[in-house]
Amino acid sequence: GEDTLSLHDALPISEMEAFCNLCPCRIIAITGSDGKTTTSTITAELLRAQGYTVHLGGNIGTPLFDRIADIRPDDFAVLELSSFQLHSMHCAPDVAIITNISPNHLDVHPDLEDYVSAKCSIYRGQRPDGVLVLNAKDAHTPRFAAEAPGSVRYFSSIGPVENGVYCSDGVIYRAHGGKAEKLIDVSDIR
């Protein structure tokens, strides 16, 4: 006999998950308790300044699913994703960023662990070539780093990290392989 799939057997997925599954370009997905919108906006603007076409969506900007036919493989999609979107979502962004975790939305999530678990969905589906970017000073970072399917980078506004970007004495550095490279003075950022 033929294998058939009835509508009854289908699993519903959100518009954002459908977008992630069909999007032809690289996806940078951002979540966290605080700083999602700022980080998403700055990420999109930095990519635009480098000449890339960027599609900003999720909790910010306009819905992207209806514009998927206009997205080219060499573009970037920058997505701000909330715990509500991530709770039942399976996504595999090329780069996943978690800004921080603090007790939030506990009126919707039964407890902090459920909230944290929802946030973890941002990286759980990543491929081995995916990158997870974490706040070096967040208490949940060791857990996230241990679970990451791909490589991990860190950021810190209060001192050095081994592999990532940090700010120290008014200067932003990129660290990799035991060496730190000066990127820019904070005072030069406009």
Walk through the language-model features, giving the residues of each.
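Compositionally biased, intrinsically disordered low-complexity segments
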Residues: 9, 125, 144, 175, ...
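Adenine nucleotide phosphate-binding catalytic loops in nucleotide-utilizing enzymes
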Residues: 109-113, 150-190
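Single conserved hydrophobic/aromatic residue that forms the stacking wall/gate
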Residues: 1-9
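Helix N-cap / beta->alpha transition motif
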Residues: 7, 135, 182-185
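Phosphate-binding loop of NTP-binding sites
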Residues: 14-136, 140-149, 166
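Ubiquitous "structural anchor" signal
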Residues: 9, 66-69, 178
